[in-house]
Structures are given as C-alpha cells and as structure tokens.
C-alpha cells in the first residue's frame, strides 16, 4: 500500500476512534490543531497562556525568596565576552520571572576589551538584588561554573548559558515540581525540563526538544537532558562540581555523576529554557566545537569505570552521539524461535541470511511449524534440517493462528540463556546483528529485552521501537522514515529506552520470559509483544532498541491483511480493548519514553496539534529510576 495512503487510513481510523472515545468536539479541536500545525507552519510559542502567567505572578505578589514557599534555585552562569544584546535578553528573562525563588550567580571571565559585560550586569543588579556577580580569571567553562557556585545560597542549582533565555515561569514551575515530588514521596534531588531552540525571538522558536522521562541508555548515547537541569547544591558540592578535564561536555559528565548518586531523575514536560542557535553554539552542533566529542567520550568512559561496567565508547552514527560497545559476559546461547506456516521461500531467505551472515556462533534455531498445508513445506523442513546445523523443527499441535501460544510452545524446546523471537519474513542485513542484541542485554546492568532496526524492502523504517498510545494503542517510532536519518533528537540513530519493541525481532533473557510466564495467549495476533514488554517493564526491567542490529522485514506476508475480514477485525478490536483492560487506558496513552507535547496521531515525533499541557502550564513531574 502507498505510504501516504497508509498514513491517511491510520489517521482516519484514529479520528473515528477518538470520536467514539471522547466525542466529536474533542476530535474537531485536535483535528484543527493538526491542520494548523501541519499546513500553516509552526507558530507555537510553547509558553503558558497570558492568564496562567498572570496568575502565577499574582500568587507571588509581595513574596520574597524566603517566604514564597518555593525552594530557592541558584542559577550558575559563566560569562565570557557576552554580546550585549544577548546578555540583556538573558538577564531580562531572569528579572521577569513569575516567582522570586531564583538567584542568578554570574562568574565573569570576560577580557579587558569587553568592560560592557560588567556594566550591563551592574545595571540589572539595581533591578534585582537576586543577581550576584564576581569577576574571575578565565579557567574554562567548568572551572568558571564552579566559581559561580561559590556565590550560590539556594538549596538547588541550575545551569544556564550566558546567551540563552529562561522561560518566564522557569523558577515557578521547577519550584512547584520539587514540592510535588516531595508530596508524592519521590526523590527530589535531580530534575530536568524540556527546551526549545530559537534564533532571535522565543515567541518564534525553531523547534521544541520534547524529551522522554529519564532514559539511562539514551543518556549514554547523547546528552538529551541539556536544559533546564536542576539539582541539589549539596550533591554538586559533594561531587566536587564540574570537572575541567571534561570541558566541552562538562554538563553531560556532571549529569552522569549526579545520577550515579541519585539513581534516577525527574522530568517536567514544560519548556522552561530557550537555547539560542548561532555560530559557535553547541545547539548548532558539535561541528562548531570539535573538542566536545573527545570530552564526551572521556565522560562516558569514566562513568563506565565508576559503575563497574566494561565496554568501549565510540563515536555514534551522527555528531553529538556516541555508542557503547558493551563487553558480553560469558558465551550465552541464543535460541531463535521462528513460527512458520508454509511460505518456505520466505523461511529459506530468513534462515540463509542467519547462517551466512551471523557472526555470533552460539545459537540454535527452532522453527515452530503451525498448520502448513503445502507438502513442499514439509519437504523443505527435512532438507533445511540437513543443511543448517543447529536447526530443528517442532510442530505446534493446535489449530488456527495464535502467535503467543506458538512461541510459548517453542520456548519449551529452547535451551538458550536468551530467546529471540523472529518472524519468518525477515532477512538479516549486518553480521553482528545478534552480537549487538546481546551487547545490550548480556552485561551487568543490561536490559532484559532488546529490539532491532527493521526496514521495509523500499529502505524506509518499519520499526525503531514501539511507543504506546500512538493511534490510541501503540505504534512504531519513525515508521516510514527514509533509512539513514537521525530521527527526532537522534532517536532513530542511538540506543533507546522504550516501553516496548516489536516481536518481529525481540531478544529477551530466558529467565525473564519465564518470570512473566511468556506471552499472554489471549493476545492471539495483535499487541502480544506490547503486552509482554509492559509486563516485563512493570517488573522493573529495562527494554531497549538498537540501531546497530538491522534486518529487512517483509511484513506479515504469511498472515495477510486483517482489514477486510470481519472476524479478524472483531478479534483485533477485542485485543485493543484487552490492552486497555490489562494495562489501563491512561497508562497506555502516557508512555514515559514519549512526551505529552508530541502527537498521538502519527509515528514521526511531530508536535501535538494543541499543546494543551504547555498552554495550561501544568506542573506534572515524574521521577524514574535508572
């Protein structure tokens, strides 16, 4: 089916379902937002509405940092030859905060040719005595940040660059977020928000950076946290502040060291920081600052050493990204489970690619025969078992098709420490695909499940992880995107934390499979992989996806389409409802590795049509452990 037509059908299906669930007015409102965003450009400001900001200001009238009820946040900012217009905009964004719980700590290392930096700061100090300043020798950004910290009196610290802009509600929202965490009994030691890029006017941002909740594997591949990060001052001092030897990636290094102590982080999905894009800024890419990559690899290598893990840190697929090649513990055996009904030509393509390309040699393949009718299929099985050492065919004794039951049956014949669910209509592309899947799981602290990059034959993406809530239930990250792209915030080009991955290629520790009792056989065809991953996640295990294990997926040739068959359509609807019944509709629609400012209508990480959560300024913060 044509990709555009397929997208249109998916969108129409979601509109129909949304109308049923929430009514026509809601569907029309979201549809209007989608059309406005899609066809009339991105004019979203990401700011709360005027009345929301006015209400915050009114709440704080007559209050000071000491009696406003919010924790004080000291913002650390090194200054160096800052252009006057940028500096004024930055200082103005602090002065015009809706709450008084901020302190701005400035360490100025500007040279003698730029006396206007101090002059401008002194001017703004008359407007707000919460701005503190000291002149320092230029010892680099980390050392200068540490110098700014000596001025801090707040319980919390934040980091801001001298040429950026704070959202007007940044201090208010972060202060409220800390209180909310305390009310919930969750850790309040490290928080971060979303951000946006801009060039001249924050009311006309280029793009929003809408981040997932804390994602440890993603953080090892790039500093997705960036701004605005807030953390306890006592913890910063305990760690000795920022490390000058990591200048260029000092914040990434700091965040890794903080999380080693906190065990996680809290995410507030509000745009609280505007990152200016100009020549020389890291927001424009590390091409402007080549030393960043070396500093980042040092930060990551040191992090592995401190946490007792072994692996090699390499450059990633794109600048600003990195790859950890984990050392695999032992020589684990992998049992590859492949359900099959007829289509011997597809199966042969799959098996041949496994044996001809796979570099990891400790594996077995179990083909699970289910209700084939073509005599040639059974002749093929006998021939294949002779040609492929380590292949065995087992026969599922039931009738019909039940993906879950078939794989549960196949697991009984498996002897490996790891199980790999694999469709019969996939073809291996790179030799270390299985090694890479094992790298993500078979090391101390590794994930329980790892999924692969799957391509359609036309070189577009079929699977780069699963996001729950897309289309109302679940969808594939970056589906239909052209191969070779980085995706949204590098999310199609770096190892990622996800709530689920597709069962078309899914590696799982056998012990974890057994712990959750395998696949739920009430999900005969759809959502069995999503349900399985969610049950594993709920046990406290991690699910990741890697772009370095690549296969081509000739999707669902064996089963054919379900769209026009009323029996299959009814079964699909029942499985959709069961997904809600088992896991809760609210949780399905609130994937922690997605973001409420991103659309549920498409699989491309585009912005939501209405951005209600931003306009209403809702403070909903969530802590997530490593």
Regions found by a protein language model. Name each.
Residues 2, 6-68, 289-331, 458, ...:
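C-terminal, non-catalytic tails of nucleotide-sugar-dependent glycosyltransferases
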Residues 31, 35-288, 302:
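Nucleotide-sugar donor-binding/catalytic module of glycosyltransferases
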Residues 136-152, 396-414:
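Glycine-rich, basic loop-to-helix element that forms the pyrophosphate-binding segment
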Residues 154-165, 416-429:
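Short beta-strand-to-loop acidic/aromatic patch adjacent to the donor-nucleotide binding site
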Residues 169-206, 426-473:
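Conserved donor NDP-sugar-binding/catalytic core segment of glycosyltransferases
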């Amino acid at each position: 089916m044509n990709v555009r037509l397929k997208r249109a059908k998916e969108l129409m299906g979601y509109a129909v379902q949304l109308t049923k669930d929430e009514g026509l007015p809601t569907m029309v409102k979201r549809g209007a937002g989608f059309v406005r965003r899609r066809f009339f450009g991105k004019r979203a400001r990401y700011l709360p509405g005027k009345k929301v900001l006015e209400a915050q200001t009114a709440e704080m009238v007559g209050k000071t940092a000491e009696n406003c009820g919010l924790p004080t946040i000291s913002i650390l900012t090194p200054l160096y030859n800052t252009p006057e217009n940028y500096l004024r905009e930055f200082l103005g964004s602090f002065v015009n905060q809706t709450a008084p719980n901020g302190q701005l700590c400035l360490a100025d290392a500007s040279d003698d040719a730029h006396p206007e930096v101090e002059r401008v700061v002194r001017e703004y100090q008359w407007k707000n005595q919460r701005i503190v300043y000291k002149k320092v020798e230029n010892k680099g950004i980390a050392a200068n940040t540490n110098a700014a910290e000596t001025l801090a009196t707040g319980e919390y610290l934040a980091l801001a660059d001298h040429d950026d802009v704070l959202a007007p509600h940044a201090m208010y929202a972060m202060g409220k977020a800390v209180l909310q965490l305390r009310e919930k009994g969750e850790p309040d030691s490290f928080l971060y928000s979303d951000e946006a890029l801009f060039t001249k006017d924050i009311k006309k941002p280029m793009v929003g950076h809408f981040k997932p909740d804390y994602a440890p594997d993603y953080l090892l591949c790039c500093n997705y946290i960036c701004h605005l990060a807030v953390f306890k001052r006592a913890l910063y001092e305990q760690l000795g502040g920022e490390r000058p030897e990591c200048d260029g990636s000092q914040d990434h290094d700091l965040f890794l060291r903080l999380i080693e102590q906190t065990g996680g982080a809290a995410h507030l999905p509000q745009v609280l920081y505007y990152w200016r894009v100009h020549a020389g800024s890291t927001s424009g890419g590390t091409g402007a600052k080549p030393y960043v990559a070396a500093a980042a690899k040092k930060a990551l290598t040191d992090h592995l050493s401190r946490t007792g893990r072994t692996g090699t840190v390499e450059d990633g697929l794109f600048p600003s990204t990195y790859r950890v090649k984990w050392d695999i513990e032992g020589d684990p055996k992998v049992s590859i489970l492949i359900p099959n009904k007829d289509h011997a030509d597809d199966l042969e393509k799959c098996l041949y690619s496994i044996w001809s390309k796979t570099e990891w040699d400790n594996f077995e393949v179990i083909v699970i025969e289910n209700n084939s009718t073509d005599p040639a299929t059974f002749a093929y099985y006998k021939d294949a078992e002779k040609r492929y050492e380590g292949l065995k065919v087992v026969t599922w004794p039931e009738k019909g098709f039940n993906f879950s039951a078939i794989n549960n049956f196949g697991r009984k014949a498996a002897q490996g420490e790891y199980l790999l669910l694999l469709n019969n209509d996939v073809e291996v592309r790179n030799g270390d695909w299985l090694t890479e899947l094992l790298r993500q799981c078979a090391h101390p602290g590794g994930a329980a499940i790892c999924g692969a990059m799957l391509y359609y034959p036309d070189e577009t993406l079929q699977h780069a992880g699963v996001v729950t809530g897309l289309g109302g239930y679940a969808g594939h990250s970056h589906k239909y995107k052209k191969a070779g792209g980085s995706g949204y915030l590098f999310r199609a080009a770096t190892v990622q934390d996800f709530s689920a991955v597709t069962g078309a290629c899914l590696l799982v520790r056998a012990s974890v499979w057994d712990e959750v009792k395998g696949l739920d056989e009430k999900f005969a065809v759809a959502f069995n992989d999503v349900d399985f991953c969610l049950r594993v996640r709920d046990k406290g295990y991690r699910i990741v996806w890697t772009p370095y294990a690549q296969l081509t997926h000739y999707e669902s040739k064996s089963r054919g389409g379900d769209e026009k068959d009323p029996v299959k359509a009814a079964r699909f609807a029942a499985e959709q409802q069961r997904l809600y019944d088992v896991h809760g509709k609210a949780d399905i629609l609130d994937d922690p590795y997605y973001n409420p400012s991103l659309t549920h209508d498409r699989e491309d990480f585009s912005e939501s049509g209405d951005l209600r959560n931003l306009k209403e300024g809702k403070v909903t913060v969530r802590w997530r452990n490593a």
